[in-house]
From Swiss-Prot:
Its EC number is 3.6.-.-. Belongs to the TRAFAC class TrmE-Era-EngA-EngB-Septin-like GTPase superfamily. TrmE GTPase family. GTP binds at residues 224-229, 243-249, 268-271. The keyword Thylakoid does not apply. The gene is mnmE. Binds 1 potassium ion per subunit. The lineage of its organism: Bacteria, Pseudomonadati, Pseudomonadota, Gammaproteobacteria, Thiotrichales. Homodimer. Heterotetramer of two MnmE and two MnmG subunits. Exhibits a very high intrinsic GTPase hydrolysis rate. Involved in the addition of a carboxymethylaminomethyl (cmnm) group at the wobble position (U34) of certain tRNAs, forming tRNA-cmnm(5)s(2)U34. It is found in: Cytoplasm. It comes from Francisella tularensis subsp. novicida (strain U112). It comes from the Bacteria. GO terms for cellular component: cytosol. This is tRNA modification GTPase MnmE.
């Protein structure tokens, strides 16, 4: 069991509220709580009492003691439910510190839960995901990860992989046997099954990352092309000022929306043009910088000639900025103001036709965005995932392909080695083998009281 010092923190969000919760965890949690309350606390009982600093009453509320290991962290845990005034809560924190506790670091309660085997690393990450979920589907998916769906899939895969690796190694360890184990159809079928499962998990992880982290869309284009109108149309509200004056948007405007439950972070940028205006020029610099961070760029244009669509690329429309835009970035050309055309072309490839002002073609654009980012699975059975999960699964997938090659070549030792590498990558997902640096990075992203 993880039994270092005793930690304390406010577990509820900052600000005023009806109730504020303070969490204490560690070997001295009960002793500290009994000093604060001057009560003997029974495990799993709600005790209504005063909370003191020495002999001065700070507040009164409900105190619950969770005896190890039947607690969130696996240690002795006490939760004090007081009035949700920040000044009151901070006074209780100070009193707990005076009794020997220390302030918890970000995510330290969940880190202790992980180190005490109350949950694995994917479940620990799901705690943060469920707190930060920005859509209903994302919240449900995070809940599935928290209850262990993702972990079970990885562990079932590991079980099959380890069994196969042991079988292969047995063929290496007993060369005197006249049977060629590598020609055994059992190995071929088992390896093929593992390959297919890893491929399926790889695809699920990609969907899970989209739900957990969302998609960043950047709206760029020349001034007055309708970027702000498009932002408002996608958001379904007036998020940006729209005028006929070119250069109205001079800074970054952000909006968070959902498209079919997928979180989208939309950023409207200053129109790209050479400008003598200092503020507008700074906005254009920021726009170029944001383009480099985008998952997808929506290049908004109203470039028509004689009421006909002109198929120009970025190099033609804004040649002065072309060299500053990454060449590998995914760009969709959004042809706005189609209400001005006599005949509207059909959407094709990366060209979508809309009228932001009249809300024409917006649903088709949303559908196009989801397809471009690769979100196809809207099944509620999907779980959330992180970029590190995707990296680990991608690496495992590459090495399982190498394992298949070694099997075809009859190289038993190299086959076993590739299977071991796959196993290590899968273990890193659930935290079976994780470096201190990785753990520090993961838990530091949590809020203090979790």
């Amino acid at each position: 069991m993880y039994t270092k010092d005793t930690i304390v923190a406010i577990a509820t969000p900052q600000g005023n509220g009806g109730i504020g919760i303070i969490r204490i965890s560690g070997i001295d949690a009960l002793a500290i709580a009994e000093k604060l309350t001057k009560k003997q606390l029974k495990p799993r009982y709600a005790t209504f009492c005063n909370v003191y600093n020495d002999n001065e009453i700070i507040d009164h509320g409900i105190v619950i003691f969770f005896k190890a290991p039947l607690s969130y962290t696996g240690e002795d845990v006490v939760e004090i439910q007081a009035h949700g005034n920040p000044f009151i809560l901070n006074l209780i924190i100070k009193a707990a510190l005076n009794c020997g506790a220390r302030m918890a670091k970000a995510g330290e309660f969940t880190e202790r839960a992980f180190l005490n085997n109350k949950l694995d690393l994917t479940q620990a990450e799901a705690v943060a995901d469920i707190i930060n979920a920005s859509s209903e589907i994302a919240a449900k998916s995070a809940a599935k990860s928290l209850q262990g769906d993702f972990s079970k899939e990885i562990n079932n895969l590991l079980e099959k992989l380890i069994y196969l690796r042991m079988y292969v190694e047995a063929s290496i360890d007993f060369p005197e046997e006249e049977i060629n184990f590598l020609e055994d159809q059992k190995i071929h079928s088992s390896l093929e099954e593992i390959y297919k499962v890893i491929l399926a998990v790889k695809n699920s992880c990609k969907q899970g990352v989209i739900l957990a982290e969302g998609i960043t869309l950047i709206l760029v284009g020349k001034p007055n092309a309708g970027k702000s109108s498009l932002l408002n149309a996608l958001a379904g509200k007036e998020s940006a000022i729209v005028t006929s004056i070119a250069g109205t948007t001079r800074d970054i405007v952000k909006e968070h929306i959902q498209i079919n439950g997928v979180p989208m972070h939309i950023i409207d940028t200053a129109g790209l043009r050479n400008s003598d205006d200092i503020i507008e020029s700074e906005g254009i610099k920021r726009a170029i910088k944001k383009i480099q961070e985008a998952d997808q760029v929506l290049f908004v244009t109203d470039d028509y000639t004689n009421s006909q669509v002109k198929f120009s690329d970025i190099k033609e429309i804004i040649p002065e900025f072309y060299d500053q835009i990454p060449k590998d970035i995914d760009i969709t050309y959004v042809h706005n103001k189609i209400d001005l055309l006599k005949e509207v072309p059909h959407n094709h490839a990366n060209h979508i036709y809309i009228s932001a002002e009249n809300n024409i073609g917006i649903d088709k654009l949303k559908e196009h965005i989801l397809n471009k980012v690769g979100y196809t699975n809207q099944n509620e059975s999907i779980y959330t995932a992180r970029e590190r999960h995707v990296t680990a699964i991608n690496n495992a997938f590459e090495h399982i392909k190498l394992a298949k090659e070694q099997l075809e070549l009859g190289n038993g030792e190299l086959l076993a080695e590739e299977l071991l590498i796959v196993q290590e990558y899968l273990n890193s997902i659930t935290g079976e083998f994780s470096s201190d640096d990785l753990l520090g990075e993961i838990f530091s992203s949590f809020c203090i009281g979790k």
